[in-house]
Curated annotation (Swiss-Prot):
Underlying gene: lpxB
Lineage per the UniProt record: Bacteria, Pseudomonadati, Thermodesulfobacteriota, Desulfobulbia, Desulfobulbales
Physiological role: Condensation of UDP-2,3-diacylglucosamine and 2,3-diacylglucosamine-1-phosphate to form lipid A disaccharide, a precursor of lipid A, a phosphorylated glycolipid that anchors the lipopolysaccharide to the outer membrane of the cell.
Alphabetically ordered keywords of this record: Glycosyltransferase, Lipid A biosynthesis, Lipid biosynthesis, Lipid metabolism, Transferase
Catalytic activity: a lipid X + a UDP-2-N,3-O-bis[(3R)-3-hydroxyacyl]-alpha-D-glucosamine = a lipid A disaccharide + UDP + H(+)
Naturally occurring in which organism (per UniProt): Desulfotalea psychrophila (strain LSv54 / DSM 12343)
NCBIfam families the record matches: lpxB
Known EC number: 2.4.1.182
GO CC terms in record: membrane
Gene Ontology biological process terms from the UniProt entry: lipid A biosynthetic process
Family membership: Belongs to the LpxB family.
Gene3D superfamilies: Glycogen Phosphorylase B
The protein's name: Lipid-A-disaccharide synthase
A molecular function (GO) term: lipid-A-disaccharide synthase activity
């Protein structure tokens, strides 16, 4: 529907619960505003959405969790968010509800919206092709249009009777390098080294406590086994303070390693690295776009892992390998995540033929992701629903 046919000043509610969803949601809102400046926005999100003038009805950080078990401690916040957002849907119905990722919460909210006659656009759908496929029917009943971001998802949903459109991956709009390697190193006072290795344990407290100690032990082992200097780069997300890093091993290792904790220039940091060990998640696609050789790891609570094994029906857990349809990067899962194994794999990426092979595979994955412009395409889909 074009702007002339839409009611001027329509409100759109945008709901997301992850840091990555906040970024993708902000890019979508920005694209919507460029196409129709009269639109207003409310919803649940974080600082990126807030910076665009979105009325934040509930701070997404309060319900951001990792793993099945960890959800229980956040139930009061989840119910509070549900109550506030459902009340807003009823008392001031938006022209459109846009839900981003966060499937269990968002599908609950979508049910309320549909009951009120509010159209629902699901941008960045859950990975139902991997696990909990029973949600496919629920998604169809509670949404009107899907904007999918992985190449194979459009056909997957359409074969099951869903209105789905592939818009491309939004990371292609985000990932850009503004500083050269030399400029980045100079800016952050990082001295010369033979190799630079990235330690990316995730952006949540649970991930960091589960992975950072072993990342640091692996770094020490790697440095001890190599005759040349290695510098380690540790990006810190806005959701994490330095004290949490110190409590999870940094205090012990910061004097034993040449390690640099950096809170900005995220993509420049990644591009600077000769190899990276990263927690499974969106960051692996960012690294793939930058074509940085990586080792991907995942560890959760024993109960969450046990439940996940019963539900997940895929060969790989990293997005890079799932998109490629084969093993491009090595994956370490649960008890496989040890300092010894990490150091061995990183050494192979740095000094063996494996680094070249992984780089070639990542170029293929980068190409499979398509072209930039996901936010603009998603905005067109959203506006067609109002």
């Amino acid at each position: 529907m074009d702007k002339q046919k839409r009611e001027t000043g329509s409100e759109i509610m945008v709901v997301t619960g992850e840091a990555s969803g906040d970024i993708h949601g902000a890019n979508l809102v920005r694209a919507l505003k460029e196409k129709d400046s009269s639109l207003s926005f409310s919803g649940m999100g974080g600082p990126e959405l807030a910076s665009l003038g979105v009325e934040i009805l509930y701070d997404a950080k309060k319900i951001s969790v990792v793993g099945l078990v960890e959800v229980f401690s956040h139930l009061p916040s989840i119910f509070a968010a549900k109550k506030i957002l459902q009340r807003r849907l009823k008392n001031k119905p938006p022209a459109l509800l846009i839900i981003i990722d966060l499937p269990d919460f968002n599908l609950m909210l979508a049910k309320k919206a549909k009951a009120l006659g509010i159209p629902v656009f699901y941008y960045i759908t859950p990975q139902v092709w991997a696990w909990r496929s029973g949600r496919i029917k629920t998604i169809g009943e509670r949404t009107d249009q899907l904007g999918v971001i992985l190449p194979f998802e459009e056909e997957f949903f359409r074969q099951r009777g869903q209105a789905a459109s592939y818009v491309g991956h939004p990371l292609l709009d985000n990932v850009s390098i503004k500083l050269s390697r030399e400029e980045f190193l100079t800016k952050h006072r990082i001295g010369p080294a033979a190799k630079y290795v990235g330690l990316l344990p995730g952006s949540r407290e649970k991930e960091i406590s589960a992975l950072l100690p072993d990342f640091l032990r692996a770094a020490k082992r790697l440095q001890d086994e190599c005759s040349e200097k290695i510098s380690f780069l540790l990006p810190i997300a806005a959701t994490i303070d330095r004290e949490q890093l110190l409590e999870n091993g940094l205090a012990e290792y910061q004097d034993l390693l040449d390690i640099h904790v950096i809170s900005e220039d995220r993509y420049e940091l990644m591009a600077c690295c000769d190899a990276v060990v990263a927690a499974s998640g969106t960051v692996t696609l960012e690294l793939a776009i930058l074509e940085v050789p990586m080792l991907v790891v995942y560890r959760t609570s024993p109960i969450s892992y046990w439940v996940g094994r019963k539900l997940v029906k895929i060969e790989f857990f990293s997005l890079v390998n799932l998109i490629a349809g084969r093993e491009v990067v090595t994956e370490l899962l649960q008890d496989e995540v040890t300092p010894e194994r990490i150091s061995i794999e990183i050494k192979e990426l740095l000094y063996g033929a494996k680094g070249v092979a992984v780089g070639k595979g990542l170029r293929e994955v980068h190409g499979l992701l398509g072209e930039a412009g996901a936010s603009a395409k998603a905005a067109d889909l959203a506006l067609s629903m109002i």
